[in-house]
Amino acid sequence: MLALGAVATLAACSSGTTTAADSTSTTTSVAREAGPRVAVSYEGGLRVLDAATLETVADFDSEDYTRLNLAGDGRNVMVTTSQGFQVLDTAAGTTDEPVLTDTVFEAQKAGHVVRHGGKTVLYADGTSDTTIFDTAALESTDGLPEVESIPGVEAHHGVSIVLEDGTFLTTVGNANGRTGIEVRDTSGAVIARNDQCPGVHGEGTAQNEVVVFGCENGALVYDKGEITKLDAPDQPYGRVGNAYVSETSPLIVGDYKDDADAEGSLLHAVTVIDTATKTLEVVQMPEGAEYTWRGVSRGPDDKAYIIGTDGAVHVFDPTTREFTASYPVIGEWEGPTEYQDAHPGISITGDTAYVTEPDTDGIHAVDLTTGDVTVSSTLDITPNEFVAVTD
């Protein structure tokens, strides 16, 4: 087992990077302003939009299905491909042209991307290996930055995170299932472990570096060396699968599913996990509104903003456990057959939420201080995953 301080792979090592096959690009004549960008995936390609106008800045060929995650530096996006994690430079905050770079962090079944404490952490489901690098190094390095590699034990769909003091948290599982997490110090020694989290999935870090992992029957909370299991009110199945966090709030908003046999991806309740009091509560969505894992984001005042099947963005205050406002944005929609299928999502930067509407190939910008739609655009592609990128 490699300690976190050990450098396992260097940027100069040619084995750590590949060249994306047949990646072609198109840039537009739209005048570029130095501001935020929106990166959008669609079948067979990637699109970069000017966040202020929602006009196309650049377009790139890619694979039929890719996932997008912020790299954490306010400029780059990690594109999950069959080769690994490919770096898309959106040029956010500059007047440069976006570039789908040849920089690829190779990974078998590339999975979760976590950003915390100046580190970006990549997880390979096919090996359970974890790759860690300084987030800022993406902008200062031509090609792969220096990385730390933590070998996995048994392959599973998992996630890892590194805290600011070097403490390493990672999920535990194998081909038969996932059971919990373990925590290691900087020497690689296991200092805490919990195997009472069936189907462990999703990770979020709240205020004071308290970390939450979702379980099929509740959640695990790691706080300063101790792991606490929080039971869901519905047993034996009450699944928290994704954590939506603000690092300035002790309250984590999670998704929630109480029927293991329910088909599709639509959900009708959220959870509030108080990392200070170590409690978990379930709150029902407003009547007539459901959502998916793609439809939740934290925003102004540490509130959660949820795009519902009724077409409205619902504002949820985790402090009061109440929905406080509803902003109509798009038409009503139905849940996807498969979770990968294109369906509405939300991404927030500052006071602006971006909402996709695949049924109309649309994307909309919403002023969260007023609820007004400020800009709308109809694309010539159907948006799937997307992220708003700001410097």
Residue ranges of predicted features:
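Acidic, serine/threonine- and glycine-rich low-complexity intrinsically disordered segments
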Residues: 175-295
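A short beta-strand motif characteristic of beta-propeller blades
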Residues: 52-61, 92-105, 139-152, 188-195, ...
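Repeated scaffold domains used in trafficking and secretory/extracellular systems
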Residues: 24-30, 62-76, 102-119, 149-165, ...
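Bacterial signal peptide processing site
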Residues: 14-17
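Long, acidic/polar, low-complexity amphipathic helices and coiled-coil-like
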Residues: 93-214
